[in-house]
Amino acid sequence: MTRVPQFENERAVSWKSVIPPHTESTMHRHDRYRTIIGVVGGDLTTVSPDGKKTVTRYETGKAYWQAPMPPGETHKDVNETGTTIELIVVEMK
């Protein structure tokens, strides 16, 4: 998984996530509101520390709004598919 910085200013930070097949991120959390845009869409699995899986389908060319995670919650992102997923994330500060 690669994170490519796009821009940062006093109001927002943006990056492109490139998620090759069968790769995963480290455990992390999202403390801010964010918009996610599918550049090359696909099904991305989030896995909580207790092993619970949630699959989110990101469609190419579509934008998604996500709220901050509840306090103390973490997850990792896993691409269990056979294709690379590319997402642009714009996180509000």
Annotated model-derived regions:
Residues P70-M92:
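Ligand-binding loop in jelly-roll beta-barrel domains
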Residues S14-K16, L44-T46, Q66, L87-V89:
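Short hydrophobic/aromatic-rich beta-strand segments that constitute the beta-sheet cores
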Residues S17, S25-H30, T46-S48, V55-R57, ...:
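Short histidine-centered beta-strand/loop micro-motifs
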Residues E8-R11, G51-P70:
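Short acidic-glycine-tyrosine-enriched beta hairpin
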Residues H30-D50:
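Glycine- and acidic-residue-biased ligand/ion/polar-headgroup-sensing regions
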Residues M1-M27, D31-I36, V89:
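A short glycine-rich, His/Asp/Glu-containing loop-to-beta-strand
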